[in-house]
């Protein structure tokens, strides 16, 4: 039996890791971007980001003051689990108090803060059923400088691949420097209005620099990435070659009359941490 306490402790560890330690794939992408940059301000900004990442790990403190809204992805296998949501919520509360992590969650109308990063329907928990002998939990802290620039379109099927490219590029360029570029762009194609955005967010969990195994999707990722970086928006919107580190796409089948497109923009701090709990 995977108890509530086991889940709580694992979520505490993952949330703490996610806000403090940036993945090696993102760090390498930033280092590679620095080598390619010719713009002085762009170099300065990427150097500052890399130094910030280093200091966060050394001091054990969050890499950004916006520690985001905790988004949780669960893969639930053939295991016995007790009080999953309660365990997740208690782990988030514990990390908020002890790391500490800035409390960001408020009532949308009164703006009163819960002070524990948990609230009505928060954290959002996506559950995927799998045929394995473990419970896997991923924490994605999503900052709202980037989240506020997400976009969704119920495109017509006739708009096709060119319409997808145009909407994604247009959405990122419209955001300019607001999402703290260099960004990572998650794109969801297909499904429904809500599913395409969920897929876009899930796409952010993919390795930066690693292409989609579907050749057609991989080509689309590369084409969108090239177009965005040709804009010259650059790091923090101050000019340069690197507006976006990578574009990640997930697709779903959809209704014959629709082509939903969801664009989820993530700042340079593409933070997430994953852990597994086995039944034994």
Where is each model-derived feature located?
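Non-transmembrane, aqueous-exposed alpha-helical and coiled segments at domain scale
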Residues: 1-187, 192-280
């Amino acid at each position: 039996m995977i108890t509530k306490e086991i889940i709580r402790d694992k979520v505490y560890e993952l949330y703490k890791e996610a806000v403090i330690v940036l993945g090696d794939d993102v760090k390498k992408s930033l280092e590679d971007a620095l080598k390619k940059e010719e713009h002085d301000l762009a170099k300065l900004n990427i150097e500052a980001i890399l130094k910030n990442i280093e200091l966060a790990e050394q001091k054990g403190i969050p890499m950004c003051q916006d520690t985001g809204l905790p988004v949780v992805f669960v893969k639930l296998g053939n295991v016995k689990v007790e009080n999953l949501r309660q365990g997740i919520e208690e782990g988030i509360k514990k990390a908020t108090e002890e790391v500490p992590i800035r409390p960001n969650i408020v009532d949308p109308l009164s703006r009163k803060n819960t002070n524990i990063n948990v609230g009505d329907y928060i954290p959002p928990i996506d559950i995927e059923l799998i045929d394995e002998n473990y419970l896997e939990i991923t924490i994605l802290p999503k900052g709202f400088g980037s989240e506020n620039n997400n976009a969704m379109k119920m495109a017509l099927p006739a708009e096709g691949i060119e319409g997808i490219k145009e909407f994604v590029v247009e959405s990122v360029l419209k955001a300019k420097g607001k999402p703290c570029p260099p960004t990572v762009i998650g794109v969801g194609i297909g499904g429904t209005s809500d599913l395409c955005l969920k897929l876009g967010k899930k796409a952010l969990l993919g390795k930066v620099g690693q292409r989609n195994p579907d050749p057609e999707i991989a080509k689309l990722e590369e084409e969108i990435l090239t177009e965005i970086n040709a804009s010259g928006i650059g790091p923090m919107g101050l000019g340069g070659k690197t507006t976006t580190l990578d574009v990640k796409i997930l697709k779903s089948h959809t209704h014959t009359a629709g082509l939903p497109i969801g664009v989820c923009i993530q700042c340079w701090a593409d933070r997430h941490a994953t852990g597994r709990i086995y039944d034994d």
